[in-house]
Amino acid sequence: MSTLGIRIRWRAATDCMAIDGIPRYAWGVPTKTYGQMCPLARSLDVLGERWTMLVIRELLLGPKRFKHLLAVLPAIGSNRLSERLRGLEQAQIIRKNTLPPPAAVAVYELTEEGERLRDPLIALGLWGLDLPVDDRIDPQTARAELVALCLAGTQTKLLDPGRGETVEFHVGDEVFHFQLRHGRFLPRSGPSPTDPTARIACDLQTFMDLALRELTPSQALKDGRATILAGSRSSLAEVFRVLAYNPQAPLPVHA
C-alpha cells in the first residue's frame, strides 16, 4: 500500500472517532475494541474474535460454502459462524459470490484486502509448527492441506516465476491441489479444475514425514508409501523441495 493510502486510512480512522474516544473504522465497525490507535490493536479489533482467523484460514484455500465451513469448524456452531462471516464482510475482508455453472452455488471468498492476510497468517502458522501439542487437541483434526498452506510460502525463492503447473494430492480422504503461478505456490481445497501436471497419493503420516524432512521422496516411492497416479516421478521431489519445513527459512514476505 502506498504512503498516501496509509495516510488516508489513518485520517479516516481518526475522523471517525466516537464521542467516547473509541475508533470506528470506515471499512468495518468492530463490535468490540481495545480502544487504541496502535495498528496491531486495531487489527485485533477486526481479527481477534475466537474462530475469526480460522474462517480466514479456510478461505485462503479457496472459496467455501457455508456448510463446508461449518463441517471443518463444527464447534463454532451455525449462529456464531454467521456472526463471524457477517463481521468479516463488514470489514471488507470477505465477500459473497456465486460459482459459475455447473456448480452455481453461493460461496464466501477473500477480497483483495483479505488476501493481504495470507503472509501474516502463514507466518503465524509456521510459528505454531514448533509449539508443543496440547493434550486436549483432537489428532483427528489434522489435515495435510493446512500444513501445506503454511509451508507453501516458505521456499518460494526456489520456484521459477515462469513456470505454471498444477499438482494434485490425494492424502487419505483429503483432496487438494497446488497452483504454481507467478512464482507462488498456492494450495487450494478439492481436485484441480483442470488436468493437473501430476497427481500424487499418500497417507497423512507420509505427507507429514515428507514435509518435516523425516522421509525423502525417493524413499517414499521406493517403499510404496507414495504413489504417482499421473505425471512424472520427479514431481514428488519437486513439490517437497518447496514444501519441506526449514525452521531457519525467513518468514514469507511478498510484494
Residue ranges of each PLM-predicted region?
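N-terminal helix-turn-helix DNA-binding core of bacterial DNA-binding proteins
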Residues: 38-77
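Acidic, aliphatic-rich amphipathic alpha-helical segments
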Residues: 113-184, 233-255
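Basic amphipathic alpha-helical segments that dock to polyanions
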Residues: 81-91
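C-terminal interaction segments
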Residues: 193-255
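Short, intrinsically disordered or compositionally biased N-terminal tails of bacterial proteins
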Residues: 1-31
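Basic, amphipathic "hinge/linker" alpha-helix immediately C-terminal to the N-terminal HTH DNA-binding motif
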Residues: 48, 100-124
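Non-DNA-binding regulatory cores of transcription-related proteins
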Residues: 179-181, 188-196
